[in-house]
């Protein structure tokens, strides 16, 4: 999956308990990708809780952009989410597509 997306640094399968289940990295992100995903996991839980509280439907995807990178978080089920980290100038559309197309495969890998 990473090789197919320009500017990709990592893809991780995470539990909502903020524990990385699996992770693949390539290249040098310039920061600790796993720590970033773990810390964002707490924020993601709060966003999910808020969405449920206001009745806005089920959370599907979150994109977090910083001056140096982007992280796409894709909800897989009630227990897991996938995080795709890429450079700011990486191919965001292709990364989103890859996560969406492989979501079922990722869920099956932990079931």
Please identify what each model-predicted range represents.
Residues 1-111:
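Non-catalytic interaction/Regulatory regions outside core domains
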């Amino acid at each position: 999956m990473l090789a197919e997306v320009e500017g990709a640094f990592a893809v991780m399968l995470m539990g909502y308990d903020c524990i990385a289940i699996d992770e693949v990295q390539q290249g040098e992100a310039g920061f600790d990708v796993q720590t970033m995903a773990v810390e964002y996991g707490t924020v993601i839980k709060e966003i999910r809780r808020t969405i449920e509280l206001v009745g806005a439907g089920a959370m599907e995807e979150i994109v977090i952009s910083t001056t140096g990178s982007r992280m796409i978080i894709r909800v897989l089920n009630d227990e897991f989410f996938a995080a795709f980290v890429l450079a700011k100038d990486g191919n965001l559309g292709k990364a989103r597509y890859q996560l969406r197309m492989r979501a079922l495969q990722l869920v099956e890998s932990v079931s």
